[in-house]
């Protein structure tokens, strides 16, 4: 009888990476047991030979499954879906809904750069931002809110029929604004808040974090 090799998630030591968030929530929602290893990015631990060579890109999050290593959050989510098909899904089952969810996961990683810069995740878990959004930041905030509102069903529930990791990722992005007192459309705000209180999300959000050191 063989034993399934264990999973280990490699996370940043401050737990502020939105991409670590994605993987952490996905693992919790799939009900998969996993160990956690923190990588001290502020000390350059990601550049150490062992981690860099095994993860290939030297980035967090990274996932180890037995002797297999993988980095990049969307790749990790896809791997978990395929490697553990009997566990609860974190992407929609319908092919078109799944494609749309993947579109959103890709979009928030490749667009909205001004918002990510001006409302970094440090402002969610450490000191809030005191600077108003620039024109570019405001445009990105408005675009994010518009996209979510376009996707929202009338009842305000999950975006693609049943909850998916795209719901949590979009809500996390919206909370860069919410936690810094940005006024959103009430429907969008209510939806983001409902997603924020999901137990797997709250487990990440309420983790104890060390004093922040910039890197």
Region spans (language model):
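Phosphate-coordinating loops and pocket residues in cytosolic domains that bind phosphorylated ligands
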Residues: 53, 197, 206
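GST-like domain detector, emphasizing the conserved glutathione-binding G-site
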Residues: 1-135
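A generic structural-conservation signal
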Residues: 36, 60, 186, 204-205
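GST-like fold's C-terminal all-alpha helical module
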Residues: 4, 108-199
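Conserved beta-strand edge residues that scaffold enzyme active sites
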Residues: 41-42, 191, 209
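Terminal-tail/helix-coil boundary detector
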Residues: 204-215
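Active-site-flanking alpha-helical
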Residues: 81, 173-174, 205
